[in-house]
Regions:
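N-terminal hydrophobic/helix-forming segments and targeting peptides
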Residues: 1-176
Length: 176
């Protein structure tokens, strides 16, 4: 087995944003790679990839679901900040200060960061004690927005997907 190839493919697949309900790009990528290797993959109704890999007797079958954790915009706040609802088992404390991408249904992809509301440790005396939830965190867009109208003018709306940077690292010792 060519481990460099396997790790390269894994890193490529992990870099594709694919929270549940938004998996077409990842499933298409995986299907394309399997097709290039001479297999005949099929996509399931729910967005997974099914592929018979062959073999003698009982053939080996691959069934892959390619969804990851993510979020969806629940509210655009009056100050232009965004609250999200989790998709899958996403936890706010695990993604505080993480970079994210918002996929607008209308106008492209925008970047931002999930952070604690009132994130200044110099001003917020309870910063260290504040419970991190999706009610106490917000996405700050990397755009010059100051209001909900500014955000909507970009084409961003409630229901748009929010995907977090997976920060995939493969160490020299083989840890991923």
């Amino acid at each position: 087995m060519n481990m460099d190839y396997c790790l390269s493919e894994l890193k490529a697949l992990l870099s594709i944003d694919s929270p549940s309900g938004f998996t077409d790009k990842a499933a298409d990528y995986l299907s394309g790679e399997l097709t290039a290797l001479g297999y005949a993959p099929e996509k399931t109704r729910k967005g997974g990839v099914f592929c018979c890999l062959g073999g003698e007797g009982s053939p080996l079958v691959l069934m892959a679901h390619v969804d990851t954790l993510g979020g969806m915009i629940s509210t655009i706040k009056p100050n232009g900040r965004i609250t999200i609802t989790p998709i899958g088992g996403l936890r706010a404390e695990n993604c505080e200060a993480e970079n994210c991408r918002i996929y607008s249904r209308f106008s492209g992809v925008y970047s931002g960061t999930l952070q604690l509301c009132n994130a200044s440790i110099h001003v917020n005396g309870s910063y260290g004690e504040k419970l991190r939830t999706f009610e106490t965190t917000e996405v700050v867009l990397d755009e010059p927005v100051k209001s909900a109208d500014d955000v909507r003018a970009l084409g961003i709306e409630a229901g748009d997907f929010v995907c977090f940077d997976p920060r995939t690292v493969i160490t020299e010792s083989g840890y991923i």
